[in-house]
C-alpha cells in the first residue's frame, strides 16, 4: 500500500469540520421556503447564501460556506438582551414585567398573558418589554448598552445596517401595536416611540454566522466568551436565558424543536439560527429562506443533523460519577518521591493507611462529589485525605458546595484535607474557595508529590519520629556506600570535597557533563526534569548525580531546597578508586542497582494504580 504524501497530513480536516462540509453540500440542494419580505429590505437577501459555523468552548471556531456574509440579527438579539436586562436591572424587576411561559402563538402575536404581561422574552411583546425596561433605566444610552453587550458576546465590535433599520421602522406597525398594548398595561413607559426605535435598531445589528456561533458558545460557556475569555454576563442570567430559549426560543415550533433536536436555540427572520448546547458548543447558521414558522429551512436541517449525528440532545446525557476517580490509594502503594531514612520508613510503613490519596478527573459535579464522599467512607478513617485536582477540568457550584459540606464532616472527624493540582489564580480554585474559605482543616499544595510529602512528614512527627534537615550524615552512613570498609571509606573521603549550597541554588543542570557525583551531607535537594516535573526530594544521606556512573551528561536538574552541604567526588577520581578497589566497586554498583530497582518499583506501583482503578 502506497503511503499518502506528507502534504496530506497538513491538508487533512478535523472530523467536525468535515461534518459541517457535508451538511453544507447536502443541504445546499434544499430550496424550499421563502425569504422574509414583510420587511422590504430583508427581501433583498440572496436566497443562495448558506453559511455554517461552530464554536467550541476552548475558543476554536469552525466555518464553512458563507460564514462571513453579514446579515441582521433580528430576533436572535432577544436572548442576549434578556440576559443583559437580568444583569442590569435584577431578576425581580424583569420577572415582574415579563413571563417565562411558552405562548404557542407566532412570534409577532399581539396578545398578553392573563396577568397582562408578555408570555416570555422570546416573542416580540416580551422582547419589546425587555428593551423598554433597559430604556427606562438607561434612557438615551439604552441602545449603546445593548450594542456593546451584543459586541461582547460576539467578541468584536458590531454595527447597525441602517437600511434595514429604516425599513423595519417604516413597516413596524405591528410592533407599534404591541408597544402601545404594553403601555396600556403599564409594562413599558410612556415613550413608546423611543423604545421601539431602540428595538428596531437592535434587530438591525449586523452579524455573521461566525459571530452567532461565538455568541452561542458564550451562552453555552456560562457567559464566558471562549474566544476573548471575557465574562460577558453572569452565570445566573445565562442559565435563565437558556431556560427560556429551551421552552420558547423557536416560537410555535418550540415543542417540536426540543423534542426532535433538544438544543436551546433562537432563530431570526433574517435567516440566522443560533444553538447553544451548555458546556459543549455554540452553532451559528445563515440561510435566508424561511419556513412557515419564520425559521431558516436549511438552518433547521443543520441543527437536526448535528444533534442526530452526534447524539447531542440535552436530555439524553450519560454521566457516570464513578469515572471521576482515576486513582485511589494510600502512601503504602505510592509514597512521595522523597527518599526517606530507615526510621521514617518504618513509621510510614506502620501507618500507611493514615494518608489517603484520591486523584480526580473531569468535572466536579454534585454526583461526582457524592460518589467520592461515599467511596471515602467505605474504608477506615485516615488522618489525611489528599484530593488531587490537576486533571479536573471544571467545578460546578453544586459540586463545590457539596465539597464544602463533605470537608465540614471530615473536619468534625479530625481529618485534614489537602488539595493539590489547582493554582490559586484559577477559576476552579475560586469556585472551591467560595464555599471552603472558612474551613480550618483544608491545606493546599500545587504539586501532588509535595502534598504527599507534607502529609508523610506529619505522620512521622505524630508517631514519635523526627526529621532534622540540619543533621549531618557522613560517608559511612550513605546507602550507596553501604558495605565499604573503614579504609575504603577513608580513601574515598580523601578524594571528596565538601560543597556548600544556599537555598534555591541550582546544583546540577540538564545537559551538562556528568563529571562528578554527590553525597548529600545535610539539608535537602530536589531533582526535576527540565519541564518542572519533580522526580525526587533527597535529604541527608542520599546520593545525587549518581547516574554519572552510567551516563555522560546530566539528565535532570538539582536544586537546593534549603541550605545544604554535600560531598563532591570528581568522576575521574571516583573511577580510579573503583579500579583500585574492585570489591568496593562491585559493592557500590550493587547498591546503585538496588536504588534504581527501588525507584522502578515505586514508578511501577503508580502505573499499576492508574491503570487498575
UniProtKB/Swiss-Prot annotation:
List the keywords (alphabetical).
Hydrolase
Q: Does the keyword Lipoprotein apply?
A: no
Record bears the keyword Cell membrane: no
User: Where does the chain bind substrate?
Assistant: 75, 124, 168, 175, 199, 251, 269
Which InterPro entries does this UniProt record tie to the protein?
A: Beta-lactam/transpept-like, cNMP-bd_dom, cNMP-bd_dom_sf, Glutaminase, RmlC-like_jellyroll, STAS_dom, STAS_dom_sf
The chemistry this enzyme catalyses reads: L-glutamine + H2O = L-glutamate + NH4(+)
Where a nucleoside 3',5'-cyclic phosphate binds, per the record, is at 480-595
What's the top EC group for this one?
hydrolase
Q: Name one GO molecular function term.
A: glutaminase activity
Where does the STAS domain lie?
A: 345-457
Q: Per its UniProt entry, which superkingdom is the organism in?
A: Bacteria
Which segments carry the region annotation Glutaminase? 33-315
In the record, biological process GO terms are: glutamate biosynthetic process; glutamine catabolic process
Read off the Pfam families from this record.
Answer: cNMP_binding, Glutaminase, STAS
Entry EC no(s): 3.5.1.2
User: Could you describe the subunit structure of this protein?
Assistant: Homotetramer.
What's this protein's family per the entry? Belongs to the glutaminase family.
Q: What is this protein called?
A: Glutaminase 1
| Originating species | Bradyrhizobium diazoefficiens (strain JCM 10833 / BCRC 13528 / IAM 13628 / NBRC 14792 / USDA 110)
Q: What is the lineage of its organism?
A: Bacteria, Pseudomonadati, Pseudomonadota, Alphaproteobacteria, Hyphomicrobiales
Primary gene name: glsA1
